[in-house]
Amino acid sequence: VLANVSQLQRSQLNELQTFVKDGGGLMIFGGDQLDQRWYNEQLLPYGLLPARLGEVADKRNDPEPFTRMVVQRFDHPALKIFSNPRNGDLASAEVRQWHRTVEDPDNELVRPLARLETGDAFLLEKIYGNGRVLFCATACDDAWSSLPLRPFFVPFSQRLCTYLASSVMPSRNLGVNEKAVAHFPADQAGQEVMVTGMEVNKRTKMG
């Protein structure tokens, strides 16, 4: 999770890119410490930012000093539970500041999961390699919105993180005759391993 992180060192950026490309998940929150120029010039070309960042929108001095998420029926697995307001009304959060994004409608690897009433993207997802990146346009504390003050914030965050982890962590519960899947670093491909169990010992190669 990058929560209002200004920049990363080159070595960190390289490691993060490899992690996501190999199936890891990355969650990015905005905020006042985020270096917009660095994100656009470094994180975006590395494939780790769903869209170019624009200016920071600020409604604090407007007659209505906030916007909200658009009420909708979510079909995304991480948000589907919130289609029922009894599980948490996402539209009740007041968003005062957020990063505007410049979306590319032709990029099939990026999709908006939630929007604000202004039309700006609130939550964007990008598929990168075998992994996923989620970008939330506001901060994860209460500096820019009332999101963390709402009862649904903890399950909302947990759902997002669980979804991101699901691409790299196969289910531990298997049905009868279902194949067991385990992920290993790419540089171990082709190495021989021993699979042991109650009734069988078998050598196989990782692919």
Positions of PLM-derived features:
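N-linked glycosylation sequons
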Residues: 1-207
